[in-house]
Amino acid sequence: MSVNEIILDMAKAARAASREIGKCSGQVKDKVLTDIAALLKEEASFLYQENAKDLEAAKESGLSSAMIDRLTIKEATIESMAQGLVEVAAMADPVGSMVKMWQRPNGLSVGKMRIPLGVVCMIYESRPNVTIDAAGLCLKAGNAVVLRGGSEAIHSNRALGQVIAKALAKNGLPETVVQLVPMTDREAVKELLAQEEYIDLVIPRGGEGLIRFVVANSSIPVLKHYKGVCHVYVDEGADHGMAVNICQNGKVHRPGVCNAVETLLVNEAEAAAFLPKVAEVLGKDGVEFRGCPKTCAILKDAKPAQEEDWPAEFLDLILAVKVVKDMDEAMDHIAKYGSLHTETIVTDNYTRAKRFCREVDASAVMVNASTRFNDGGQLGLGAEIGISTSKLHAFGPMGVEELTATKFVVEGQGQIRS
């Protein structure tokens, strides 16, 4: 069979399977999730064996140590994946719930009910745990899902797919509820992105290059975020100790993730006193500072920032720093260079905090808290399938509810329209 025929058959099978999973009770879906969790532990030796094939190929191809670490399935990885599934199973089933209800003057009751999206296609890179996260959330929301992982994790993903298939079969559901694309070439991705008749939503998760490729080639709606250019603005009168802690956590905790802080904006009234403090603490962590002329005048070790540093997602121990006149200049900078991901203000001024929240355009705005909290688990959504910086359908971390839509349900007593 050609790539086109294989992908078309998968898409058709997913559409048929979506009707089966869509009408499943919450109890059945939760049983599938807990069975997958149990099977992950039972099949650990098999998963390690298949993962070893990917690790060997990764080392031979010269993949970075950081990428190899993300690719590795360890005991802790399996425990984390299993625990995540158990937590999703414990969540309330969103499908069939009424979002709101109201009465019309003619006696009609009008409501909005949560329903599955249908078929989700997830295209992602590197981390095998995304296979389990995506499958678990889609199942909980009553969706069928087609998964296309990165070529570097092909053996690991196939093994995880077999575990999922066992759990589906055990509970009387078609294995086509969760399908993994068996080939790794880009042609398969292009074919997937052309299946608008059968696939309802595409979610790419990976580097900016992958996401732009998906957006450019998809005839299906795409939920995405290109990059996370997150800012911390230190306001006039801000608590310096708090601001240093927030900057350190945002930059150093995990510099390679999308909710890490990339640019620090400091009110000019605080710059002379605050910048040496933050430089001393973050400097010990190996952070390189790239500053505006005013910053460089205060921090002699800072490198002059170039224009390309302001919109940069460094994903490294590098921090761009700019001294601004006031909050308006900070918000103007964010509007020009931000990526609609996460923005933080450190302030003790209630009025300015509220204005910052209202006017700054981002999927999450933090007041006196780290950018690192823009995460489904941290915000109480449970697991997440990614963070969307698209405003249509979902904005911010995408949990189970974001993998559903709503339909109108109208109840009457024989009313007809005049």
From Swiss-Prot:
Pathway given in the UniProt record: Amino-acid biosynthesis; L-proline biosynthesis; L-glutamate 5-semialdehyde from L-glutamate: step 2/2
Subcellular location field: Cytoplasm
Enzyme class of the recorded protein, top EC level: oxidoreductase
UniProt cross-references to InterPro entries, sorted A to Z: Ald_DH/histidinol_DH, Ald_DH_C, Ald_DH_N, Aldehyde_DH_dom, G-glutamylP_reductase_CS, Glu-5-SA_DH, GPR_dom
A GO molecular-function descriptor: glutamate-5-semialdehyde dehydrogenase activity
Catalytic activity: L-glutamate 5-semialdehyde + phosphate + NADP(+) = L-glutamyl 5-phosphate + NADPH + H(+)
EC number(s) stated in the UniProt entry for this protein: 1.2.1.41
Keywords of this entry: Amino-acid biosynthesis, Cytoplasm, NADP, Oxidoreductase, Proline biosynthesis
A cellular component annotation (GO) from this entry: cytoplasm
Pfam families reported for this sequence: Aldedh
GO biological process: L-proline biosynthetic process
Role: Catalyzes the NADPH-dependent reduction of L-glutamate 5-phosphate into L-glutamate 5-semialdehyde and phosphate. The product spontaneously undergoes cyclization to form 1-pyrroline-5-carboxylate.
Family membership: Belongs to the gamma-glutamyl phosphate reductase family.
Protein name: Gamma-glutamyl phosphate reductase
Organism annotation: Desulfatibacillum aliphaticivorans
